[in-house]
A protein has these predicted regions:
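Mid-length scaffold segments of soluble, non-membrane domains
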Residues: 88-90, 95-104, 203-247
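Extended, aromatic/histidine-rich regions of cofactor-dependent oxidoreductases associated
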Residues: 241-245, 255-259, 264-266, 270-308
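N-terminal pre-domain segments of enzymes
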Residues: 16-66
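Forkhead-associated
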Residues: 62, 67-133
Length: 308
């Protein structure tokens, strides 16, 4: 090898390797959340859901509902009471008096009811029509007055109810990122009310929030949510083809965040849950409105826990 060739060879060996040219930046493709993230989030959500359901005032404690007639009606654990209270409530606990749209309650002597932690000696009761109702408590039993159209009823709960004590959980479909979909909220051209049927046989008028348009397995579907006053979420009452054999027959509930500035809403069907009527025959549940029964099996969220 000549002297010049040797020098060039040594110089090339001593030089650092050339850095590769940077690749042009690629536009990031949209990705679904990893399945394990969806599973963990669903598990955390469901733990909170079960905590609320099994709380001392949860739906598992609902043991009675009596619609009041005009005039006086007795309340107590004695057979023949107009408003039946579970033992260990006194056989004669007091008297309800309905006068038109107002209801009062007079405790019987020795029945130590409380209202907001203070002794209640009698008087008018606030219903659930506009905000939180008055809740009277006596031991493990509590009751409140609810209004449903022209009906006024006494809703009775018992924290020692068998349904609460014997509760063993609710089966879930395996969480899947495929059921966390992005929807587009199409607003109504003008404000309108949605006719929502109920298990009581009449329909309630609820404020429409528009129409959610989304795609599952390449097919477009639509759902109509309702907008509850003061809520930061959309409320959806829907049915699907799993109601026939795997989920609660009357449909399920789903909540979703309000749309972003572009009208996008994330629908996480992994969080679809059973209405109170799946656990007690004394609830007054809304049912899916016309158009909210999907012609697809939504195999996500809670499965059937028992019909009533």
């Amino acid at each position: 090898m000549s002297t010049l060739a040797l020098v060039l060879s040594l110089a090339l060996q001593a030089s650092p390797p050339a850095k590769p040219l940077p690749k042009p930046a690629a536009q990031a493709a949209p990705r679904k959340a990893p399945a394990e993230d969806v599973a963990a989030a669903t598990q955390a959500w469901h733990a909170e859901r079960l905590q609320r359901l099994t709380s001392p005032d949860g739906w598992l404690t609902l043991v009675g509902l009596t619609w009041l007639k005009e005039g006086e009606q007795t309340a107590g654990s004695a057979p023949g009471s107009a408003v039946v209270l579970p033992a260990p409530a006194p056989s004669r606990a007091g008297t309800f008096v309905r006068k038109g749209d107002s209801v009062s309650f007079q405790p019987a002597p020795g029945a130590a009811f409380t209202l907001e932690g203070k002794p209640f000696t009698g008087g008018a009761l606030k219903t659930d029509e506009k905000g939180a109702p008055d809740v009277l408590r006596l031991g493990s039993v509590n009751f409140q007055v609810i209004r449903r159209q022209e009906r006024l009823g006494v809703r009775v709960k018992d924290s020692e109810a068998a349904a609460r004590k014997q509760f063993h959980g609710i089966p879930l479909y395996p969480a899947s990122a495929d059921w966390k979909v992005e929807a587009r909220l199409v607003p109504d051209e003008k404000p309108r009310m949605l006719s929502v049927p109920t298990v009581l046989g009449y329909s309630e008028e609820m404020k429409s929030a528009g129409t959610l348009v989304f795609t599952v397995a390449g097919k477009e579907y639509r759902l109509m949510p309702v907008a509850e006053d003061g809520s930061d979420e959309l409320f959806i009452i829907f049915g699907d083809e799993t109601n026939r054999d795997a989920t609660y027959g009357a449909g399920r509930f789903l909540e979703a965040p309000l749309p972003d500035k572009d009208g996008r809403v994330v629908l996480d069907f992994n969080r679809a849950y059973n209405p109170p009527c799946a656990f007690t025959r004394f609830a007054t549940c809304p049912l899916p409105p016309r158009g909210n029964r999907l012609a697809v099996r939504v195999e996500a969220g809670e499965k059937r826990a028992g019909d009533h």
